[in-house]
Amino acid sequence: MKLAVIYHSETGNTRKAAEFVRAGMEKVEGVEARAFSIDAVDEAFVSEAGGVIFGAPTYYAFASWQMVQFLQTTKLPLTDKLGAAFSTANFEQGGSEIVLENINDMLLAKGLLVFSGGVSHGMPMTHLGANAFAAGTSIEARQSVLEALGEKFAKKAVQLF
């Protein structure tokens, strides 16, 4: 099964986070996962994918305008795919959880089935998605959460499709 990660990154942190999410997806047998910047999406691959996780940096408690514009204008066939979100931020209280909600709302409006890791899947919890904070540390410090989102998402995609 093909799964995709589509992200926007200004500083490289969201790109690194996307790679961790992709690596988590590939822990599931039979999954081929690829990550794409919004500027270089392989439309054929995403069209064939059963699910897509979107990631964006947090600016003023909102997803980057570039990701918002991408989601609002893309012509990719996303309806009925499994979707999820992750975000990056410089501060724990910087609004990254709001970004997860921003993206999830847009995915619902586009007709995706929004994945929730829920609390029943154990730690780390990824019920709205995954967020990573860079302040005082590195994105690598949140690698396990990002990989967990990718792996949980991939397991559900394989089960559904």
What is the role of each PLM region?
Residues 8, 14:
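Glycine-rich phosphate/diphosphate-binding loop of Rossmann-like nucleotide-binding domains
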Residues 2-3, 16, 20-161:
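FMN-binding flavodoxin-like domain, especially the glycine-rich phosphate-binding loop
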